[in-house]
């Protein structure tokens, strides 16, 4: 029979707590991108922030920036622990950190899909019904680090549609965000703009209609990309593995343990009929083609 002193027993009991990552990370910050206006994105992510705070037992803060690069650089500078990226902004973070990021989860939709689509929109009354009709017009991409708002449409325009944007359109610019691009199309600032949707019932402009930002029938889709893998929840690779797993596991159970909070987080509007069902584990291999595509785009720019 083995006997333990009181001191030894206390040490054994305390050992797991002594190694807990919370001692070094009493505050966790997660960054969110600028796809919608700041008030709405903060409101939509608040239920998840509160859930993580209660579940993990540490303070959780939301970090926002005026553009995608602000969140990417915050992660590269170790100012935030977690980022909710799109596929292209994840690839940008991967490059900016020399591979120092780890993706763990992406969105899982009720259909079983883990992807979405880049689209180009125009005003329905503009007479622009296809990309060919937009020759010489003003086109807006969303942000240089946006997957659906820039990288995918730019890549496909050149390699699939045989359109070089800088030569085909009269003007090529960046709107700064998806909502700003759609708004610019509606008010006539842009003739066309790149954004995203999940399907005909759910996407940026449909959600803007539901929020009363634009009217039904003002915006029409004129082009659609192949499916894009949804962007991942991403962690700095220099974080404790236990922290990464604990936060990932907490996000995974958010849909079932806070049903109302998840509804607010996932829908943007009560009219969304293709709700996000939850999350699915992913790894970097799912996004390597995006990294390669971004490198191709950079090479095209250098060559030009």
Language-model region placement:
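Pocket-lining segment of extracytoplasmic ligand-binding domains
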Residues: 138-242
């Amino acid at each position: 029979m083995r006997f333990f002193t009181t001191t030894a027993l206390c040490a054994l009991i305390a050992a797991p707590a002594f190694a807990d990552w919370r001692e070094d990370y009493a505050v966790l910050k997660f960054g969110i991108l600028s796809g919608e206006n700041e008030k709405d994105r903060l409101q939509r992510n608040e239920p998840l922030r509160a859930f993580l705070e209660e579940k993990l037992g540490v303070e959780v803060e939301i970090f926002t920036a005026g553009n995608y690069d602000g969140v990417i650089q915050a992660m590269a500078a170790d100012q935030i622990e977690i980022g909710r990226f799109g596929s292209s902004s994840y690839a940008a973070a991967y490059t900016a950190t020399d591979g120092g990021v780890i993706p763990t989860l992406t969105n899982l939709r009720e259909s079983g899909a883990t992807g979405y689509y880049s689209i180009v929109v125009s005003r329905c009354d503009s007479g622009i019904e296809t990309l060919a009709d937009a020759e010489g017009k003003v086109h807006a991409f969303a942000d240089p680090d946006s997957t659906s708002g820039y990288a995918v449409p730019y890549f496909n325009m050149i390699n699939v549609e045989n359109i070089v944007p800088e030569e085909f359109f009269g003007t090529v610019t960046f709107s700064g965000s998806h909502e700003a691009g759609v708004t610019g199309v509606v008010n006539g600032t842009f003739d066309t703009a790149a954004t995203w949707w999940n399907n005909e019932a759910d996407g940026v402009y449909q959600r803007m209609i539901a929020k009363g930002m634009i009217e039904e029938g003002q915006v029409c889709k004129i082009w659609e990309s192949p499916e894009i893998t949804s962007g991942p929840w991403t962690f700095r690779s220099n974080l404790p593995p236990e922290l990464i797993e604990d936060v990932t596991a907490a996000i995974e159970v958010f849909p079932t343990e806070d049903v109302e909070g998840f509804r607010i987080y996932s829908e943007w509007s009560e009219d969304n009929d293709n709700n996000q069902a939850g999350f699915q584990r992913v790894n970097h291999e799912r996004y390597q083609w995006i990294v390669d595509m971004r490198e191709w785009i950079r090479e095209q720019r250098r060559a030009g």
